């Protein structure tokens, strides 16, 4: 889940909805959007969210990531959103000057175990993930890598699985009906719920 309102406003306006989904779904909920401080993490944790995704703040405040990992361990993931290899922040509009692989290595050195990689150029395009960029990232770090952006069909899921990626985020493909979700779970596998 991404709390777009929280990302914009810096407040948890969707807290009740997120908490309800966490309580009633029986699934591990992963959420990002506007997580900028330890207080934000505490609030998101209180909603029942299992994995908390730090995005732009990982670039602007690396010490926050260190503290988050110290307190929450592998429940912290970092979003790595890149365009032409450069990490972008602030809703993908600000350049950071950081190469996505160098950024991933830095996050790994802080103890981050899960990276969510979005190639901005493919997000929402149903054109397939950026397999080459994902392969480069996978060779550079030992983190669990989740592919986000461009996943368009079940063949993409099978290829990501063959590459050894930890997971994939399916968005537009589900809403557009270009992927069979049950088959995607069967092909890609799933992490066990607690």
Description of each model-found segment:
Residues 21, 44, 68, 106-107, ...:
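Generic structural signal for hydrophobic
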Residues 12-19, 62, 93-102, 127-136:
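Charged helix-capping and loop-helix junction motifs
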Residues 1, 29-33, 52-54, 76-80, ...:
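Hydrophobic faces of well-ordered beta-strands that scaffold small-molecule active sites
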Residues 84-95, 125-128, 135-136, 144-148, ...:
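Active-site-adjacent loop and "lid" segments of alpha/beta metabolic enzymes
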Residues 1-14, 56, 116-127:
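Glycine-rich, proline-tolerant flexible connector loops at the mouths of alpha/beta enzymes
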Residues 42-45, 49-123:
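Conserved anion-binding
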Residues 35, 42-64, 119-121, 149-153, ...:
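Glycine-rich phosphate-binding active-site loops on the catalytic face of alpha/beta enzymes
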Residues 17, 25, 29-50, 132-167:
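Catalytic cores of alpha/beta
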């Amino acid at each position: 889940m991404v709390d777009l309102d929280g990302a914009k406003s810096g407040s948890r306006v969707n807290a009740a909805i997120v908490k309800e989904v966490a309580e009633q779904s029986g699934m591990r909920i992963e959420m990002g959007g506007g997580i900028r401080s330890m207080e934000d993490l505490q609030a998101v944790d209180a909603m029942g969210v299992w994995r908390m995704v730090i995005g732009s703040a990982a670039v602007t405040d690396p010490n926050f990531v260190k503290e988050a990992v110290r307190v929450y361990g592998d429940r912290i993931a970092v979003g790595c959103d890149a365009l032409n290899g450069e990490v972008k922040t602030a809703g993908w509009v600000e350049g950071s000057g950081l190469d996505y692989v160098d950024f991933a290595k830095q996050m790994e050195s802080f103890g981050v175990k899960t990276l969510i990689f979005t190639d901005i150029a493919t997000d929402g395009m149903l054109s397939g993930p950026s397999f080459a960029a994902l392969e480069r990232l996978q060779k550079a770090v030992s983190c669990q890598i989740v592919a986000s952006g461009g996943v368009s069909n079940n063949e993409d899921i099978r290829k990501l699985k063959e590459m050894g990626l930890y997971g994939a985020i399916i968005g537009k493909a589900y809403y557009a009906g270009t992927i069979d979700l049950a088959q995607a779970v069967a092909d890609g596998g799933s992490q066990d719920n607690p």
